[in-house]
């Protein structure tokens, strides 16, 4: 019986060791990707801050006719761009985004329109019988303006055709390697940041006010969505790194227990065999 128990434990130890190698490898890759994503996010934050400051300066001018990007078009429906991951093994990253989405639309599902970014968003929402009108998958490790333009084109077409009145983004804000927060940000109609202290300034447009405003508005929307996608991507890799580190640590704890159990059974088996040999020798005397 002891021999069978030892074989079973050895098999389990081997299986856990193999799994640990996988979780450790995934964790190392996630750490490398996190470093790259974080560097890109920090660079983008600086640029986005400048764009945001320009936009808040425009919004602070009460006498300026802002145009379609700044006005409510009177439609009841709201669009939510839900940013998730294409792959799993990232802890509660996707679950938190979906929970935030469900919480946000819970009071008005009929007037909520969904676009998903990432395969996991589509999969999760289908479980709750929520369909998306468009899906964007296979997002690169570092999102670029190419992906942003494709998503915005779909969203803005809905807005211009008065099928929706708002464009909101459900994303994960990267705070630090140990803290990420699922949030909702309205990007259209464009409004001043709640914490902005921007005062009204004189804004002069050349050569044409409408052309300049439209250009700045489109730049602002692209950079806002890009920043939110970079936040989400950085948060995803951080969550994956943490999840894999935790899995590797748990594997080590389990291996310690199994090795201890294996040694105890083996020691007990050896002791029993010695006792039987000694007992047999004494019986023959």
Curated annotation (Swiss-Prot):
One biological process term in Gene Ontology: proton motive force-driven plasma membrane ATP synthesis
Superkingdom of the source species: Bacteria
PROSITE patterns named in the record: ATPASE_GAMMA
Coiled coil region boundaries: none
Function per UniProt: Produces ATP from ADP in the presence of a proton gradient across the membrane. The gamma chain is believed to be important in regulating ATPase activity and the flow of protons through the CF(0) complex.
NCBIfam families assigned to the protein according to its UniProt record, in alphabetical order: ATPsyn_F1gamma
PANTHER family registered for this protein in UniProt: ATP SYNTHASE GAMMA CHAIN, ATP SYNTHASE SUBUNIT GAMMA, MITOCHONDRIAL
Assembly mode: F-type ATPases have 2 components, CF(1) - the catalytic core - and CF(0) - the membrane proton channel. CF(1) has five subunits: alpha(3), beta(3), gamma(1), delta(1), epsilon(1). CF(0) has three main subunits: a, b and c.
Annotated HAMAP family: ATP_synth_gamma_bact (MF_00815)
Protein name: ATP synthase gamma chain
UniProt source species: Clostridium novyi (strain NT)
């Amino acid at each position: 019986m002891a021999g069978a128990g030892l074989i079973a434990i050895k098999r389990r130890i081997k299986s856990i060791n193999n799994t640990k190698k996988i979780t450790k490898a995934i964790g190392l890759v996630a750490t490398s990707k996190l470093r790259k994503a974080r560097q890109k996010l920090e660079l983008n934050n600086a640029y986005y801050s400048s764009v945001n400051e320009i936009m808040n300066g425009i919004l602070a001018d009460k006498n300026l006719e802002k145009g379609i990007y700044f006005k409510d078009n009177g439609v009841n429906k709201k669009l939510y761009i839900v940013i998730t991951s294409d792959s799993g093994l990232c802890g509660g990253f996707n679950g938190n985004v979906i929970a935030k989405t469900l919480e946000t639309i819970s009071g008005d599902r009929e007037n909520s329109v969904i676009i998903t970014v990432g395969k996991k968003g589509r999969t999760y929402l289908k479980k709750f019988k929520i369909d998306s009108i468009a899906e964007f998958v296979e997002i690169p490790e570092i999102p670029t303006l190419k992906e942003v333009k494709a998503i915005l084109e779909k969203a803005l077409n809905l807005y211009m055709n008065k099928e929706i009145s708002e464009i909101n983004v459900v994303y994960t804000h990267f705070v630090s390697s140990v803290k990420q927060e699922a949030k909702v940000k309205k990007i259209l109609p464009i409004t001043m940041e709640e914490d902005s202290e921007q005062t009204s300034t004189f804004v002069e447009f050349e050569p044409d006010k409408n052309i300049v405003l439209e250009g700045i508005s489109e730049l602002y929307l692209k950079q806002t969505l890009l920043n939110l996608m970079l936040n989400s991507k950085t948060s995803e890799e951080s969550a994956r790194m943490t999840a894999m580190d935790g899995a590797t640590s748990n594997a080590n704890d389990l291996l310690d227990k199994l090795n201890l159990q294996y040694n105890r059974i083996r020691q007990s088996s050896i002791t029993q065999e010695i006792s039987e040999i000694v007992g047999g020798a004494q019986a023959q005397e």
